[in-house]
A protein has these predicted regions:
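Amphipathic/hydrophobic helical signal segments and adjacent flexible N-terminal regions
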Residues: 1-54, 58-81, 158, 170-193
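Feature targets compositionally biased, intrinsically disordered low-complexity regions
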Residues: 26-28, 99, 123, 149, ...
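Central antiparallel beta-sheet cores of small beta-barrel/beta-sandwich binding domains
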Residues: 35-142
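Conserved hydrophobic/aromatic positions in well-ordered beta-strands
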Residues: 87-90, 152, 180-183
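Acidic/His-leaning functional-site neighborhoods
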Residues: 115-169, 188-192
């Protein structure tokens, strides 16, 4: 399903380079990191605009649980929430000269918070349906797990949102933590019709 950019009316011009992210995305992924058992999950990401010079972002990840033998006979409760985060995507008002951006790229910032006690600022580049981010700052509550650095990659591939998240945490070097493949919810609705 081809993606049509939203009507720019009401969308701040500052966020035009991020417009392809807008909408609700749903799909699956996997988490695997030293000390964390490999697990499959489902995810919903919602990226929206209220007209300001930013896009709001929420993500909910639920672990996939094997259905019980009686699943066909009764309604199963939703899978447990494993992780949530929320934040904002922004394009800085001035183009940084020290980020190594190409002419086709725009600077981008992602500010995220999660209930496990972390707030992070990621900085990077957006261009040609790809976003590369590295952590600029990660702050944690005293009770939050030790995460010292992170990298994120988002890409629009054949109309799907692919992402990967690497972290350095618990004394381990930077390595793959989680990844996902999501489809635009509107495209899922069209396919089901």
């Amino acid at each position: 399903v081809p993606f049509v950019l939203p009507d720019p009316e009401g969308l701040a011009p500052e966020v035009y380079p991020l417009a392809w992210l807008l909408g609700t995305w749903r799909g699956e992924g996997v988490v695997d990191y030293p000390g964390i058992d490999e697990a499959t999950f489902t995810q919903e990401i919602v990226i929206a605009s209220d007209g300001g010079p930013y896009l709001s972002y929420t993500s909910t990840i639920r672990l996939v649980v094997a259905p019980s033998d009686t699943a066909a006979l009764e309604d199963e409760p939703p899978a447990p929430v494993w992780q949530t985060e929320s934040g904002y995507w922004r394009i800085p008002p001035e183009r940084p000269t020290d980020w190594g951006l190409t002419e086709e790229q725009h600077p981008v910032e992602l500010l995220v918070a999660d209930p496990s006690g972390h707030v992070a600022l990621y900085i990077g580049a957006v261009g040609k349906g790809r976003i590369d981010l590295v952590s600029d700052a990660i702050v944690r509550a005293a009770s939050g797990a030790e995460v010292s650095a992170g990298k994120r990659l988002y890409g629009l591939v054949n109309g799907e949102l692919m992402w990967a998240h690497d972290i350095a945490a618990f004394g381990h070097p930077m390595q793959s933590y989680a990844s996902g493949r999501l489809a635009r919810a509107e495209a899922l609705s069209d396919d089901e019709a």
